[in-house]
Each structure stands twice: as structure tokens, then as C-alpha cells.
Amino acid sequence: KVLSQNLNKDQKKDFCITHFFNPVRYMGLLEIVKNEDNDLNKINQLKEFCEVELGKGAIVCNDTPGFLGNRVGVYAMQIAMTEAFKMKLSVEEADAIFGRPMGIPKTGVFGLYDLIGIDLMADVLKSFIKELPKSDEFHEVAKEIPLVKKLIETGYTGRKGKGGFYRMKKTDSGKIMEAINLETGEYSTSQKIDIKSDKVDLKALINRNDKYGDYAWSVLSKIIKYASSLVPGITKEFNDIDEAMRLGFNWAK
């Protein structure tokens, strides 16, 4: 709406947004953001071109904050983070669960935060808070976390900074990976969490009678609930959400 506000009605018919996910060379998702004045035949032609000629997975969505992929993806990251704090999990435990066992890349949530940039994620959250209505559940997971604020203030912004939730420490015997304690803010040697992810399917994971099962179900159920609430506001098809997460965030399930 902002980009097209000075266009006349005929111009608006031919105006839409194409949002490529980074890195463009590797990520398959391309969001085509339409407006209420668009000629749908032209939108469909553009979609076909993007799929056939560019080899992208093109999804048509409405003009809403974050479009489709980031709206769900950022919410998922935030709920995974806030639940880890709430349930007193370690960053390694959270990433071991909110990772391959759930069909999500092994970076999990805290590893992904470090990869994107903790400071950049803070800016993304501010944008969502500003643009989304107060009734949107996103506000509940976008509240400032003191430890995250401290990391940014001290230059621990992720891989591009001095470290983040994880950091590499140089020792006489070489480099070791350390992880931050979410309660104390202190770093210690990162621990490998073995939940036999190669043998645990999603159903078995959420049915576990332990903190890992509780965490997995709490996160998954909230993501599904939130994603479902976005239909038909962002898209008319539930399958579009699945495709956006598969192509834009490499979710396999």
C-alpha cells in the first residue's frame, strides 16, 4: 500500500511486489504480494513465469506485515525462544528439539538467531510490533528479553559479532564451542544433547513424557494455532503456509 499509494488505479492493476528469500541462489521461496486492484490473470502469468523460467516456488499472498513466510517463521522462532526461557531449557536442548526431530534445520532457534544476527532480529520484531494490530498474538512473543538486550548492548550479536547464544573460544589446545546459560548469562562448553533425533519422529517426540516432549508440543501447537489464524487474511490456502515454510525456512515437516 505504501509503495503504490501515489499510483493511479490503472497503474495499480499492474503493480505487485516480488519478495525473494535470501540467499536467492539457494532458497526456493518467492512471494508475490498482490493488491486488491491487481488483474488476477496478470498475477497468474507472473507466477507461471517465476516458476517456469526462474525455477522458484512462487506463492501469492496478500499485502500484510511480513507477508507469509516471515510472519510465520519469525513467530515460530520467537515462540521457540520464549518457551525455552519459560521451561528453563538450555540453548542446546532447545536447538536439539526445535531442529531435525521437528523437520527443521539443525541450527534450531538459537543457532538460527546467531546466523541471522540478534540485533537484526530485534529490528524485525520492532517492525512487526509497529505494524501489527494490538490484538495479534505476535505481540505476546515479541516482548523484550533482558538477556537478549544485554547481548546486543555488549556486541554479542551472533556470528558476525563476538558471539551470541553460541561463541567460539580460543584455548591453548584450539577452539571450543561455548553456549550461554539462559538464566545466568554465563558461557560454558557446549554440550551435545542426544535425543536420538534420527530415530524420533514428530509424533513420538510430542508424546514424550518429559520436558522435551512438553517443549516440543507447546511450541508446535502454538505455531499451528497462530498459522491457522492467518487464513484467510494472508492467504486463502493452508497449503500455502506449508509451502512457504518448506521453501523459505527449509522445514521438511
Please name every model-derived segment.
Residues 1-253:
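N-terminal glycine-rich phosphate-binding loop for ADP-containing cofactors
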